[in-house]
Regions:
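Bacterial N-terminal signal peptides
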Residues: 10-22
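N-proximal helix/coil linker or "cap" segments that precede and/or mark the start of modular domains
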Residues: 28-64, 206, 217, 222-264, ...
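A short beta-strand-turn-helix
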Residues: 65-86, 257-278, 298-304, 350
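Short pre-active-site segment immediately N-terminal to redox-active cysteine/selenocysteine motifs
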Residues: 84-86, 91-94, 276-278, 283-286, ...
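Conserved redox-active cysteine motifs that mediate thiol-disulfide chemistry
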Residues: 92-104, 282-299
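Thiol-based oxidoreductase modules, predominantly thioredoxin-like and allied folds used
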Residues: 116-141, 156-166, 308-322, 334-346
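Short, internal strand/loop/helix patches
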Residues: 140-178, 182-183, 190-191, 328-361
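Thiol-/selenol-based redox modules, centered on thioredoxin-like
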Residues: 185-258, 361-409
């Protein structure tokens, strides 16, 4: 049995969180077959979240904050007192819905900054509260370091603040999902909260409630619509951390096996007979760059394994070193298909897999379902670049269809 399949039951029960349904919307989904108990527990958790973290009431004062930003500075509510209108939007790195709105958030800054509006983004999630499979649409996690990488990658023109350490600010504002926007007037009274517009795909949005609210406040008029539903990824409160640990522990409990691989087996591997996106990494225990990058490659697979991605590791250690290879793989919890070449003829290994491979290890290749090479690299890979390439090429369907384009942009 495929080792990943042994996790299917567990993953099915938490798939809604993975694709990021808001708690109120998640309750409308059908329970995954055979997972009634876990589904009931999930619904109960979402209900508790809404009760324990109510959304700030319209007309309420903006709660104060002092949070670190991706620029290395501390930012407080009072820093924005000169702005006649303040928009605070809760976003997250990992959420595909939030990613799809990044361009629209940047456009709000571009279109309204000259009119005195300040927009601030806050990341509310506890990094340890997101399960590995919930990171299946992202290159980075929800940590402050991940935020810095995302802000630089997407050139955010706004302050991006981190609340994941204590979630004290998120507790006061009560964002149900990311993205969730709150707009305050000159007296810092909440005049609008909800969605930015009415469709994940920008071209299909017909109602732009956040812009309507900004225009009304700048003109001194009442906001036409003060509240809307929100759709996105549920806020990852630290109370979810136990569930995230459970998934990681389930992965780490999987058996780690090692197969001998002949030249013919390597040639079959290169043909990608399973017709999924295939990540292949050739490595050795004596290779420092291999050992350094391997945990990051494995983590990448752990995040994306629900999206038709396979990962195969191939050790080029001498066959006599099988025990050392097994020890390394077991320590790394490498519960994937692990191969070790059955020969000391490394040039034969290279020719059997890729006749154009003309250097040593590490050697990494990404093969498309139809067998063509998407990426290959001799030497240690840039893991962020590799993740972005995978995200641009993995199947792109469902509620977040169009997300691959975000990574190709």
């Amino acid at each position: 049995m495929d080792k990943t399949a042994t996790l299917a039951t567990w993953i099915g029960a938490t798939l809604v969180a993975c694709i990021g349904m808001a708690p109120a919307l998640a309750a409308d989904q059908a329970a995954p077959a055979g997972n009634d108990a876990r589904w009931t527990a999930y619904q109960a958790q979402m209900s508790r979240d809404q009760q324990e973290h109510p959304t700030l009431a319209l007309g309420a004062d903006a709660p104060g904050f002092a949070l670190p930003g991706t620029d290395g500075k501390l930012h407080a509510l009072a820093d924005y007192k000169a702005s006649p209108v303040l928009a605070i939007v809760f976003i997250s790195n990992h959420c595909p819905a939030s990613q799809l709105y990044e361009g629209r958030i940047k456009a709000l800054v571009h279109d309204y900054a000259a009119r005195g509006v300040t927009l601030v983004a806050i990341a509310p999630n506890g990094p340890e509260a997101a399960s590995p499979h919930e990171l299946n649409y992202t290159d980075v996690d929800d940590s402050l370091e991940g935020m810095k990488q995302r802000a630089a990658f997407r050139q955010f023109p706004f302050d991006y603040l981190y609340d994941g350490e204590t979630q004290a600010v998120a507790h006061q504002y009560g964002p149900k999902v990311t993205p969730h926007i709150f707009i305050f007037d000159s007296q810092r009274k909440l005049r609008y909260e909800g969605r930015i517009d009415d469709h994940l795909r920008e071209a299909r949005a017909t109602h732009h409630e956040a812009r309507d609210a900004l225009d009304a406040l700048l003109a001194g008029r009442p906001v036409p619509v003060a509240h809307t539903p929100v759709f996105g990824c549920s806020t990852k409160w630290m109370s979810h951390a136990a569930s995230a640990r459970e998934e990681l522990q389930a992965w780490q409990a999987q058996p780690v096996t090692l197969e001998a691989a002949s030249f013919d087996a390597l040639a079959r591997l290169r043909s990608n007979p399973d017709h999924k996106t295939l990540l292949v990494n050739f490595w050795a225990t004596w290779c420092a760059p291999c050992v350094h990058e391997y945990p990051q490659l494995l983590q990448t697979y752990l995040w994306y394994r629900s999206r038709d991605l396979d990962f195969v590791s191939v050790s080029v250690d001498d066959p006599s070193q099988r025990a050392s290879v097994e020890k390394f793989l077991a320590t790394a919890h490498s519960a994937i298909r692990n191969l070790q070449v059955d020969t000391d003829d490394v040039y034969g290994v290279m020719a059997a897999f890729d006749k154009a491979w003309d250097s040593g290890v590490p050697f990494t290749m990404v093969i498309a379902p139809d067998g063509h090479v998407i990426f290959k690299h001799a030497g240690e890979v840039d893991v962020l670049a590799l993740r972005r390439l995978l995200l641009a090429n993995l199947p792109d369907a469902g509620p977040f269809a169009g997300n691959a384009e975000y990574w190709r942009d």
